[in-house]
Amino acid sequence: MSNNSREKSVDSSELSNIDYRLFQNTPAWELAKAVQEEDMDNFDKIISENPQIINYQESKYGNTLLMLTIINQQLKPFKALLKKGAAVNTHNTFDGTSPLIEACSSKYYNIIFTKILIEYGANINDIETGKRRQENSTRLTPLMAASKTGNLDLVRFLVSNGADVNYQNEFGQSALSESIMTDNYKVAYYLLQNGANYNLPIFYRYDYSIPIENSVPGDKGKPMFLMDVLKEDESDFYTDEYKYKTLIIDFLKEQGVK
């Protein structure tokens, strides 16, 4: 994007969360441009003159510039923001996500962002905050987010640094259930080997054949446990998913699960 087009006023409601123009017409706009351009000389100058804007949150998603460097995978300004004191445990106003949860949320993200955030004091057991939006029935931790991606190296790093493998949110979701629901069985097997509770339901299956007038208020449906879900899985025989599904089933049988 050219500098001229970037300066053109835009409706922030139409911008995605990767767009630095979210900071247009805010006190942090000049800093946002320096961060996007990775202009460290101008970055240092702006911060020295107005250090408090480093944690400014744009109005649509409530993201800070640190969050945008993670989303855009810009390591140089990411490190610079941290060195200047950017807050690592601030939550945005969209899903209540923090920098660390964001850094763990995509298999395409470099794990170095997560490692550096931990070095700077990010809460490894952070939890998304606030009420859930209507279309969002999750409340993630870094480990839950990582488990959904299938990035085993990232999951290993989090667990080895104290991530809670058995946190369960109000929707009954856990790192184990997230890995199973996304067919990331290699991650699920690792979690089980590191103490994940296999006795909790993976999800609840609602019986839609029951008329609404006959349904029981608050009934979540039939609890589907890990062995139930795996027995229904139809992974192809020669895939990693099938291999690790078999390992999980063997593990469960060793624990007396039928």
Can you annotate each of these PLM segments?
Residues Q24-L31, Y56-L65, H91-C104, I127-P142, ...:
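Ankyrin-repeat boundary/"N-cap" motif
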Residues I47-I53, K79-A87, K115-I124, R156-D164, ...:
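Ankyrin repeat domain, specifically the short helix-to-loop turn at the C-terminus of the second helix
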Residues S2-E30, N161, N194, N199-K258:
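Ankyrin-repeat-protein effector appendages
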Residues E38, Q73, K107-Y109, G150, ...:
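Ankyrin-repeat intra-repeat helix-capping/turn positions
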